């Protein structure tokens, strides 16, 4: 005798096979309503709401309960496709403990270009040792247990989320004839972003995929560029759930380093596209998480290596430093700094190092210093090569410095400090 429940509410297929309606049955979201069955024929009726009815075909009256059994029926394979952004649940249910000699399985399938995330919401099985010889949950890649085993679990310590390498997963729950516990509950969902990725190179893109990200997402990206360079993030699109400035629901976090223990540069949500964000070193770490409720189109981020100096810098403190970074500056840069100190004060420049491409009139690469707030002010000097005054003074409380390079030779660059006089 066999009952088949087919649930096609989320964007992948979920199938359960069972002959014990108390212990191996689908949880809510979607809810399965068991109307009882006889040994004749079962018709599965799909609803557009969150309820799926398994309707028995009987000859008058309510069907009698099935005879008691302790194992699930043989596996089968069905496919269903629906909209994204939802999660489902399965496992042992009921108010008591699971039975001895259970043998239940579930096959879960996502669309061809997606992967699955399995999350243990609870786990309480008999524990013997780390090999789980008694009661256990086995999880495999693929549609059956011939696929790569991703893990075998027992006891009470739930593992980290399990991510499939393909678009399907196979889960088997098996118990022996002795001790019983309270079972387990698994949540499954589509991985809409790329889970954990380390990205190398000087440019590229990453972000969520599809028309909307899913619930319960936990994704991260580590971006690493060559030594001496920095990472710049440019947001091509951005739309997450928003509630307030603290982003309590769905959020994107950006860290100035190689992991989430680095300095946090920002927590982002809502639909206002953020400004470009730059790292101070060669790595940046980005995490995205979503909750159980609303989903939105997500984000797409372009990363690149910026010019070795800041594109625009306004320096307003009484002292500071600025210049190129790395072993050599980049070609085709145009960078500038505006220094403004207190009224009735002057800017004092101190040249610590200076080495840029040389040309008689500094037509290739050059550093130009202006006696005012912008490049329309009178020019104090235009410099290249390795020759420059080691000390310069403004005529007022502002000074503007512009660095420009062409497309050919590169040099170590410069580093300048300023104080107030």
Swiss-Prot record:
Record key words, sorted: Disulfide bond, Repeat, Signal
Coiled coil: none
Domain CUB: start-end pairs: 72-191, 193-306, 309-421
GO BP annotations listed: chitin localization; extracellular matrix organization
Signal peptide positions on this chain: 1-24
Disulfide bonds: 72-104, 132-154, 193-219, 247-269, 309-335, 362-384
Membrane found in the keyword field: no
Source organism superkingdom: Eukaryota
Tissue specificity as recorded in UniProt: Detected in vestimentum and trunk but not in opisthosome or obturaculum. In the vestimentum, expression is restricted to epithelial cells under apical cuticular plaques.
Function: May play a role in protein-protein interactions during tube assembly.
PANTHER family (UniProt xref): CUB DOMAIN-CONTAINING PROTEIN (PTHR24251:SF37), OVOCHYMASE-RELATED (PTHR24251)
Protein name: Exoskeleton protein RP43
Lineage: Eukaryota, Metazoa, Spiralia, Lophotrochozoa, Annelida
